[in-house]
Amino acid sequence: MSTIEERVKKIVAEQLGVKEEEVTNSASFVEDLGADSLDTVELVMALEEEFETEIPDEQAEKITTVQEAIDYINAHAQ
């Protein structure tokens, strides 16, 4: 079983079409990984599905880096 960090990074790489080695913890989805607003919405949906959790819109807007996604999932996933 992969760690949450590994699973988040894999999803980010798949959703944004970047190499996994480009997905660092400090990487910004928009500035570093080239995501647009639609990409970020799809990314949040993929994270919700993978981790069977709901990410409210107001929380999703605050998740702008890989580490913030990891932290949110660690705090809220089942």
Swiss-Prot record:
GO CC annotation: cytosol; membrane
An example Gene Ontology biological process: lipid A biosynthetic process
Modified positions (O-(pantetheine 4'-phosphoryl)serine) in chain numbering: S37
Record-linked Pfam families: PP-binding
Main localization (coarse): cytoplasm
Record InterPro entries: ACP, ACP-like_sf, PP-bd_ACP, Ppantetheine_attach_site
Functional pathway: Lipid metabolism; fatty acid biosynthesis
Gene3D superfamilies documented for this protein: ACP-like
Keyword RNA-binding: no
Similarity section: Belongs to the acyl carrier protein (ACP) family.
Function per UniProt: Carrier of the growing fatty acid chain in fatty acid biosynthesis.
Protein's name according to its UniProt entry: Acyl carrier protein
Native source organism of the sequence: Stutzerimonas stutzeri (strain A1501) (Pseudomonas stutzeri)
